[in-house]
Amino acid sequence: VGGYAAEMICRAGVGRMTIVDADTVQPTNINRQLPALHSTIGKEKSAVLAARFKDINPDIKLRVLPVFLKDGNIPELLDAAQYDFVVDAIDTLAPKCYLIAESLKRHIKIVSSMGAGAKSDITQVRFADIWDTYHCGLSKAVRKRLQKLGIKRKLPVVFSTEQADPKAVLLTEDEQNKNCLLYTSPSPRDTR
């Protein structure tokens, strides 16, 4: 989600952008992520996106941070520049919630992407306040965490109303031996 959102913002002509992503392109990313090509496997996603965005808009001022966001570096990141808007596409709960909380605390506009894994019906994608979402485990977990942090403010999110297909979930390990969930989609001939 992050790569697609960032590219659309770049194509819209934004003048400055910060890209934060410490991941490298993996073969399992090719089915869904913008920077993932056979020629980019093993490269930093942030560097691949930066080169792409400079090719789209040579005048864009990019700040590229190949780091994982953690509680400790999020305030520093948000205080290092004047941000008009934050697009959150983090899929790990703790840094996602902390980025949301710190952005709201600083009155920085933010939109957050919720879970779409094991879902395939694009007609069920919605834009709503996080407090109005349903059938989304990530939204529920984020709401709980925000409540613990005392945050009950509105937060625009993109989510899916579709219930996840448990048959489409596979547990695997990534390059750092962290457990990952992979999602499969039905082939076009299997969808009705």
Annotate each language-model stretch with its function:
Residues 1-10:
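Glycine-rich adenosine-cofactor-binding loop
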Residues 11-16:
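Conserved S-adenosyl-L-methionine
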Residues 24-56:
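Glycine-rich phosphate-binding loop and adjoining beta1-alpha1-beta2 segment
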Residues 66-73:
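Conserved SAM/SAH-binding loop
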Residues 73-81:
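Short amphipathic alpha-helix with an adjacent loop that forms part of the alpha/beta core around
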Residues 85-90, 102-125:
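ADP-ribose/adenylate-binding Rossmann-like module
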Residues 143-159, 164-174:
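A charged, well-structured terminal subsegment
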Residues 183-192:
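Single conserved hydrophobic/aromatic residue that forms the stacking wall/gate
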